[in-house]
Amino acid sequence: MNELIKHKLELLPDSPGCYLHKDKEGTIIYVGKAKNLKKRVRSYFRGSHDTKTELLVSEIVDFEYIVTESDTEALLLEINLIQKNMPKYNIKLKDDKSYPFLKITNESFPRLVITRYIKKNDGLYFGPYPDSYTANEVKKLLDRIFPFKKCKNPINKVCFYYHLGQCCAHTICHTDKVYWDRLIDDVKHFLNGKDDKIIEDLRSKMLAASEEMAFERAAEYRDLISGIATMRTKQRVMSKDLQDRDIFGYYVDKGWMCVQVFFVRQGKLIQRDVNLFPYYNDAEEDFLTYMGQFYQDKQHFIPKEVFIPEAIDEELVAAIVPTKIIKPKRGEKKQLVALATKNARVSLQQKFDLLEKDIKKTSGAIENLGQLLKIDKPVRIEAFDNSNIQGTSPVAAMVVFVDGKPSKKDYRKFKIKTVVGPDDYASMREVLFRRYSRVKKEGLQAPNLIIVDGGVGQVNVAKDVIEKQLGLTIPVAGLQKNDKHQTHDLLFGNPLEVVPLPRRSEEFFLLHRIQDEVHRFAVTFHRQVRRKNSFSSTLDHISGLGPKRKQLLLRHFKTITAIASATSEEIQALGIPKTVVEAIQQQITDNKNDRSSP
């Protein structure tokens, strides 16, 4: 488990929602849903798992999540995200097929049926549901509460369901429109979560049955109430009108804005886009700028409708987005914008929490390091490393960490000027003297700690330069690597000793990052110098090829091999005369022949 995941786990909300696991490429490899995001996502990284789960966890390097209003919303969203992203760990479990809906037919005597096909103006549809089992469970519950007609064709006698109280036989039951309108309204309220009146009615019937000692009937009412509690289908994440729309929400805090966009296609929320950025003007103006860039830069599909928050001027949006702009005032559409806004707030708060934790973690590491070394808090650390290959193109590099963060504007590169051959001690002596004699002479900011890459010899050289040659009182430490070239020991003190540093401590991780960074910076610089030197030596003494033309060739082709592979026309295109190009090609050929000769 990496540091990013560790910190994100601490920030998960106790809310329902969906989580998306990602691999090192940023690809979504698994989508899941949870009643409690904190408990569910944390469970992946704690305790033991079966083989397939261990395999999944081994590939997770990051995750994100979407907060929903209910577990049902989370479940339906999970299905849509899986269908959209086809994560490799979900594909075997889910197939891409149409989803079941509940439908109240528009017949004279309406029926409640399950269908996978939607026809406009052919009845009322509720859903979609994740699978036929869920749809059937909801229908069974509705059948026990609302007596819809069960038979498709009229018959002249009551059916079996009538005797169970689950069918209103059209020959003897209510035939007036008011009855059916009221029944349909009750079902709509139930499926939209507004079931308090229904529950109260069932509770009254349960109490009445108990008073009449009809305990079996009372138990049936009790089970219905329990069934309603577990099968509510409050679907604000989904839209039943099959419309394509983008739903925008945003949140601002501490000079930052987070914009969250829900992409609804054919009535289903299939994906979301999250963008966090600093804003410098009025929040509403910057939001409008973002919308314009969103549809222009991303070549985004223009939906039939775009929902925007109430604070945004819809006329201005209409000027930059060529589609119908809606600012919902009430109902489900307004709740969808509110949900997008809520997720924007959650995402922005997570960013702040991660930053705060990172600051506290780094600050604590610096403070602890100072206490271990018995020095002042090393707010500014300067670290050095040499790089050469058998003494050729020797260079050194310095990186600077301020408050535990790289300060790249303060990085410095050094070409070794006075040392001949592979002598790391002499190279370190030269570089440190050049650096800190200038610090002393020009009154530059001195570090609180100097770190050299190396063992006892390197540290002693550094201390000799700093303390004896320059008379400075800057603490010097060394970072020793093991035989696997990994950070292993911190050397410090007089005499030098290995500082006891827990391998899993934040201070050790900080030192490891510093050593890796200075090594990377030194090696990168050495490659640049070596390539340039190789370039220069090969192209030296060619008439008509001065420093400017050499630099031009270096910037364009990067290597001698690339020049050798280029045509005369490609080289001449840089403005180099044909006679000079021929001389270059001849020189490269001669050098190649010399190297291949015995």
UniProtKB/Swiss-Prot annotation:
Hey, which family's this protein in? Belongs to the UvrC family.
- Output the Gene Ontology terms for molecular function: DNA binding; excinuclease ABC activity
Q: Which organism is it from?
A: Streptococcus pyogenes serotype M3 (strain ATCC BAA-595 / MGAS315)
Q: Where is the GIY-YIG domain?
A: 14-91
Q: Which residues form the UVR domain?
A: 196-231
Cross-referenced InterPro entries, in alphabetical order?
GIY-YIG_endonuc, GIY-YIG_endonuc_sf, GIY-YIG_UvrC_Cho, RuvA_2-like, UVR_dom, UVR_dom_sf, UvrABC_protein_C, UvrC
Q: What is this protein's function?
A: The UvrABC repair system catalyzes the recognition and processing of DNA lesions. UvrC both incises the 5' and 3' sides of the lesion. The N-terminal half is responsible for the 3' incision and the C-terminal half is responsible for the 5' incision.
Q: Where in the cell is it found?
A: Cytoplasm
Q: What is this protein called?
A: UvrABC system protein C
Q: Name one Pfam family in it.
A: UvrC_RNaseH_dom
